[in-house]
């Protein structure tokens, strides 16, 4: 029996053509047929296929690297007229590229001239995310979401109510409108509990109830879709790509800003107040601001229906230049190492925190209140900063058409309140704000309370398309009216507020916090060998050493030694988080720990120098008393010692 065939359309810069193929055929089998429609001097090894026009951020694969991949494996099994884009290079172009010492196109080659397999070439996270949308027909079926989201999906989510003795007229086992369970998105319940935003899973159930109806037995459609405010490069109309051409199918629609009704995370919980005090100590000692990244976990939050909270266990302070009115971040070279230590401890990067403090000058520790209802809560520059960080930490969910939606990344600010006390405020940038930053539609303003809308006439990027942006406000007549957002609009439309707090009983993951924090040399606090030796080897007590490693900053510093293997490093992090004595004894008997102790003993703590002792007298040994003849030669006080040192250094 002959197998059925499907029609595939191909488009290159040389034109368009069609081919009849079998769904079971492999991609490399098309090489001969494709070459018939390309110029005679085309290099066969340079042919690549993409789901989007070449160079338009599609998933580009070289044809010779798709050996063993059939058409039906990538979803080309039943439809007719599916379109693929072809890129190629001539042999002359490849020769010119080689003579100039550059690789032709985007292909990489080995020393023998053979092309490198693109599947083993390292790719960025964004490129890896796009692969799923091409090789898998439904990206939401292949995405792997967090275990917390899986647990919340299995929950009933209903808000159970007890029997109302005044209104309920039924028996104890009956139910009526006054005692039946409520949906997690019930507006009356949220207003009663003063919950400003829906939790993510409550919002998900609200929109899914309108999108997918099980009683209709229809196919599943993800109810979530991230906003897209950029010109689509894969327009099916056939016109030249933007900026040469545009149509109603590929241009973004007008944007109507409105406050976001849900939030991805509902609460930020700091495991211990020491985390905040440690960050504040830098401001108290230097008078400048400080920024740190929050490492912790996401857990269920029972105060909100189907809520999520970020539990912070550690704050890592990256390299930065601190100033009175802000910070300037430097390149964070060991970010991957810190993330790996956090992963071994069961943590992940959950947010960022920074200070914005200015002493009130009263001498009582009070600070100025700079953020309030008449000024701003998060400036336009800080919203842009938070949006870019959320962009780097997308949330994987099977309820989105792209497999990703929003972000769980939070932003916290330490600033003064109306009473002059230091308080924490937690926020997230809205999903619309993240996409507007990604599309380069908005930019921060010198006025912190407003965000500027970009102009298409900007000389730096003439190919940018800026859609119309509107927002609603109460006009002078007391009526809600839609207003054009150009040139600027209030930042409140891009913000989502979160709650914060501390647990009633503090149970931090790391029980030791005495080791110096990284990148604090400017205030005289550095991570050095002698301080590490004092904590781990100088006291000679293994149990104290086991307790001392329960410090996130110390773990990150130990990774710079490279003395532990992967298994030993995992054991080290397990001891730091569980403080298990059995694992601790196993740790101190590993070769990596022995190497570390040797290094610290050779270059760690040294006996203190006593320059006032006479050179003819031997240096006193530890545990021995000074002889009477040596006691009278030491100075009577530190001031006398300092005076003698200055006298010896006198020029007269």
Swiss-Prot record:
User: One GO biological process from the UniProt record?
Assistant: ubiquitin-dependent protein catabolic process
Task: Give the membrane topology.
Answer: Peripheral membrane protein
Report any Pfam family annotated for this entry: NPL4
Which residue stretches does the UniProt record annotate as biased composition, category Basic and acidic residues? 630-643
What InterPro entries does the annotation carry?
A: MPN, Npl4, NPL4_C, NPL4_Zn-bd_put, Ubiquitin-like_domsf
* Annotated region (Disordered), positions in chain: 95-127, 604-652
| Chief place of localization | cytoplasm
Compartmental location: Cytoplasm, Perinuclear region; Endoplasmic reticulum membrane; Nucleus membrane
MPN domain location is 268-405
Family per record: Belongs to the NPL4 family.
Question: What is this protein's record name?
Answer: Nuclear protein localization protein 4
The scientific name of the source species is Emericella nidulans (strain FGSC A4 / ATCC 38163 / CBS 112.46 / NRRL 194 / M139) (Aspergillus nidulans)
Gene this protein is translated from: npl4
């Amino acid at each position: 029996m002959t197998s059925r065939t499907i029609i595939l359309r191909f488009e290159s810069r040389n034109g368009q053509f069609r081919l009849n193929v079998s769904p079971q055929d492999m991609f490399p089998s098309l090489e001969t047929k494709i070459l018939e429609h390309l110029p005679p001097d085309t290099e066969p090894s340079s042919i690549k296929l993409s789901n989007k026009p070449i160079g338009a951020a599609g998933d580009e694969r070289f044809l010779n690297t798709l050996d063993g991949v059939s058409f039906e494996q990538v979803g080309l099994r039943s439809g007719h007229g599916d379109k693929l884009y072809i890129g190629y290079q001539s042999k002359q172009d490849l020769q010119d590229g080689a003579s100039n010492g550059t690789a032709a196109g985007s292909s990489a080659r080995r020393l023998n001239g053979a092309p490198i397999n693109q599947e083993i070439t390292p790719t960025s996270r964004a490129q890896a995310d796009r692969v799923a949308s091409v090789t898998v027909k439904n990206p939401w079926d292949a995405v792997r979401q967090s275990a917390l989201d899986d647990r919340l999906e299995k929950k009933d989510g209903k808000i159970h109510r007890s029997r109302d003795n005044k209104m309920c007229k039924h028996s104890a086992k009956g139910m009526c409108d006054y005692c039946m369970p409520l949906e997690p998105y019930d507006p009356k319940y949220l207003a009663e509990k003063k919950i400003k935003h829906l939790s993510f899973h409550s919002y998900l159930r609200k929109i899914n109830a309108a999108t997918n109806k099980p009683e209709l037995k229809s196919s599943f459609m993800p109810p979530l879709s991230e906003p897209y405010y950029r010109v689509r490069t894969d327009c099916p109309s056939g016109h030249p790509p933007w900026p040469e051409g545009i149509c109603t199918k590929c241009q973004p629609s007008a944007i109507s800003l409105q406050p976001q009704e849900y939030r991805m995370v509902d609460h930020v919980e700091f495991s211990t107040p020491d985390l905040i005090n440690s960050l504040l100590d830098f401001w108290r000692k230097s008078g400048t601001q400080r920024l740190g990244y929050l490492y912790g976990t996401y857990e269920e939050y029972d105060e909100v229906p189907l809520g999520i909270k970020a539990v912070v266990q550690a704050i890592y302070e990256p390299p930065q230049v601190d100033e009175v009115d802000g910070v300037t971040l430097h390149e964070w070279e060991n970010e991957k190492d810190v993330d790996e230590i956090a992963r071994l401890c069961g943590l992940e990067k959950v947010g960022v925190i920074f200070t914005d403090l200015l002493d009130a000058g009263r001498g009582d520790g009070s600070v100025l209140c700079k953020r309030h209802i008449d000024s701003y809560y998060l400036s336009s520059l800080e919203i842009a900063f938070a949006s870019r960080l959320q962009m780097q930490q997308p949330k994987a969910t099977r309820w989105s058409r792209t497999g990703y939606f929003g972000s769980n990344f939070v932003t916290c600010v330490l600033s003064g309140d109306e009473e002059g006390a230091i308080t924490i405020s937690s926020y997230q940038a809205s999903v619309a704000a993240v996409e507007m930053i990604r599309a380069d539609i908005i930019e921060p303003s010198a006025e912190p309370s407003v965000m500027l809308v970009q102009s298409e006439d900007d000389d730096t990027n003439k190919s940018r398309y800026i859609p119309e942006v509107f927002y609603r406000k109460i006009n002078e007549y007391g009526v809600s009216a839609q207003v054009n957002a150009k040139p600027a609009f209030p930042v409140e439309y891009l913000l989502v507020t979160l709650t914060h707090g501390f647990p009633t009983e503090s149970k931090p993951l790391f029980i030791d916090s005495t080791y110096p924090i990284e990148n604090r040399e400017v205030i005289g606090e550095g991570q050095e060998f002698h301080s590490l030796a004092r904590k781990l080897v100088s006291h000679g007590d293994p149990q104290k050493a086991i307790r001392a490693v329960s410090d996130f900053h110390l773990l990150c510093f130990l990774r710079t030694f490279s003395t532990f293997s992967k298994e030993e490093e995992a054991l080290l992090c397990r001891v730091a988080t569980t403080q298990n004595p059995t694992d601790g004894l196993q740790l101190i008997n590993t070769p990596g720990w022995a190497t570390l102790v040797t290094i610290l003993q050779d270059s760690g703590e040294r006996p203190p120098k006593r320059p006032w002792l006479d050179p003819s007298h031997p240096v006193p040994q530890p545990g021995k008393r000074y002889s009477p003849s040596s006691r009278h030669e030491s100075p009577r006080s530190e001031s006398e010692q300092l005076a003698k040192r200055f006298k010896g250094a006198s020029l007269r």
